[in-house]
Amino acid sequence: MKNNFLLSLAVFLAMPVYADKTPMPSDAPKSYEAECASCHMAFPPGLMNQKNWQSIMTGLSKHFGTDASIDAKLQTEITNWLIKNSAIKQKYSAMAPDNRMTKSAWFIKEHDELKADVWKRAGIKSAANCMACHKDAASGDFSERNLQVPAK
């Protein structure tokens, strides 16, 4: 009985450590990093749902104001992988308006204490620049223990 209590307590105490982790799947195709991370962070696919990823990947010719078109074979490979690994957690599974994570309910809730001018700091530049503040964002760790908001 005591062991069960201690085990339950340990699991409960560890929950906040894993609460903000959306790991990058180990089977990420090299094309995802090569194509997507050449302009921005290669976001863990679990941060958005299937419909968002499908919409993003079918609209690469107008990808947030840029033509990000890629070879059809690579597009299919990346799309299939993103959909396979898309959000399953309730927190991330709602549609992100305009396919922007930064407009999703979970993102707004997580960042509601930040003023609008924070995103304009030279060290951040954009709300989509996760790695500016979340030092382990590339591995899917968005926890506050690794958070460091640039002062400028």
Q: Would you name each region that the model predicts?
A:
Residues 20-80, 84-152:
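Sequence context surrounding c-type heme c attachment/ligation sites in exported
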